[in-house]
Amino acid sequence: MASKAEKIVAGLGGIDNIDEIEGCITRLRTEVNDPALVNEAALKAAGAHGVVKMGTAIQVVIGTDADPIAAEIEDMM
């Protein structure tokens, strides 16, 4: 079974679509290459409480485990 981080990566359009990622208290702040590949429903199914899209900047609201999940995703990159 895929980890929460792997599901979030898939919702963000795959590891190759993620340009930058960092944890910020309760959010994952990301820059993606193609925002059209971001699947908000998949992110919510992975446990996101909300998704904020601003061009290529995507914020995934996931709660207090944002920092460890960001670190896990960075290790995949």
Swiss-Prot record:
CDD domains: PTS_IIB_glc. One of its GO terms (molecular function) is protein-N(pi)-phosphohistidine--N-acetyl-D-glucosamine phosphotransferase activity. Residues 2-77 form the PTS EIIB type-1 domain. Keywords: Kinase, Phosphoprotein, Phosphotransferase system, Sugar transport, Transferase, Transport. InterPro entries: Glu_permease_IIB (IPR036878), PTrfase_EIIB_Cys (IPR018113), PTS_Glucose_EIICBA (IPR050429), PTS_IIB_1 (IPR001996). The active site is at residue 24. It catalyses: N(pros)-phospho-L-histidyl-[protein] + N-acetyl-D-glucosamine(out) = N-acetyl-D-glucosamine 6-phosphate(in) + L-histidyl-[protein]. GO terms for biological process: phosphoenolpyruvate-dependent sugar phosphotransferase system. Pfam families: PTS_EIIB (PF00367). The phosphoenolpyruvate-dependent sugar phosphotransferase system (sugar PTS), a major carbohydrate active transport system, catalyzes the phosphorylation of incoming sugar substrates concomitantly with their translocation across the cell membrane. This system is involved in N-acetylglucosamine (GlcNAc) transport. The PTS EIIB type-1 domain is phosphorylated by phospho-EIIA on a cysteinyl residue. Then, it transfers the phosphoryl group to the sugar substrate concomitantly with the sugar uptake processed by the PTS EIIC type-1 domain. This is PTS system N-acetylglucosamine-specific EIIB component.
